[in-house]
């Protein structure tokens, strides 16, 4: 069981809501994934319409919403988006995203740390999206973040665990859950992330852009489960040379 702040999750697969062809496909894919935490961009919600086509089906599905501050260019804008989410959605959970560069969507470490400090002081449960930077992740822990969400590779790129070496360090040192976010493009990559010891993964583009999002969501669900079980079972040690599984020495000496 995964615990973030005071909430327990049976599923270690978190999902997003972007890039789906329509809301029905989105909901069916989320249900197939068994995800219990779903991120939604504040910039996509039309609060003037009340419960719009995005929020209504998500609430009916009974999943926990994790609003994100995607689109924020600095700490001030991110804090404003988080406070709006708390007021309009009734949640103090926030996925903190600050990426001023619209081309590569790289997170701004300085602004993210500042926003995280402010939001934690205001009582938010903060899950920051950041570079796979072990030092930064430790600093975010220290200011009170409930989890850290280091990227595997650029958002939506499907490149996989490009930052694996740094993710290993973050996982080793972390005292809060590590959710690997961004760039996971295949179930095998999600399984690998879990084998490393990640507490969860967040997947959106790989599911939403699939020719069959519902089937792909099921594949990711199973991959995450298998990867976690493999980690808990204990993977064999990687060797530089060959090691016989059935030595023949005794047989030859008879």
From Swiss-Prot:
Enzyme nomenclature, EC number: 2.8.1.10
Pfam families xref list: ThiG
Pathway info: Cofactor biosynthesis; thiamine diphosphate biosynthesis
Gene Ontology process terms (BP): thiamine diphosphate biosynthetic process
One Gene Ontology term of the molecular function aspect: thiazole synthase activity
A cellular-component GO term for this protein: cytoplasm
Catalytic activity: [ThiS sulfur-carrier protein]-C-terminal-Gly-aminoethanethioate + 2-iminoacetate + 1-deoxy-D-xylulose 5-phosphate = [ThiS sulfur-carrier protein]-C-terminal Gly-Gly + 2-[(2R,5Z)-2-carboxy-4-methylthiazol-5(2H)-ylidene]ethyl phosphate + 2 H2O + H(+)
Binding, 1-deoxy-D-xylulose 5-phosphate: 156, 182-183, 204-205
Locations listed in the record: Cytoplasm
Location of the active site: 95
Keyword terms, alphabetized: Cytoplasm, Schiff base, Thiamine biosynthesis, Transferase
UniProt keyword annotation of Cytoplasm present: yes
PANTHER family listed in its UniProt record: THIAZOLE SYNTHASE
Family in the record: Belongs to the ThiG family.
Subunit and partners: Homotetramer. Forms heterodimers with either ThiH or ThiS.
Role: Catalyzes the rearrangement of 1-deoxy-D-xylulose 5-phosphate (DXP) to produce the thiazole phosphate moiety of thiamine. Sulfur is provided by the thiocarboxylate moiety of the carrier protein ThiS. In vitro, sulfur can be provided by H(2)S.
Name used for this protein in its record: Thiazole synthase
Record organism: Shewanella putrefaciens (strain CN-32 / ATCC BAA-453)
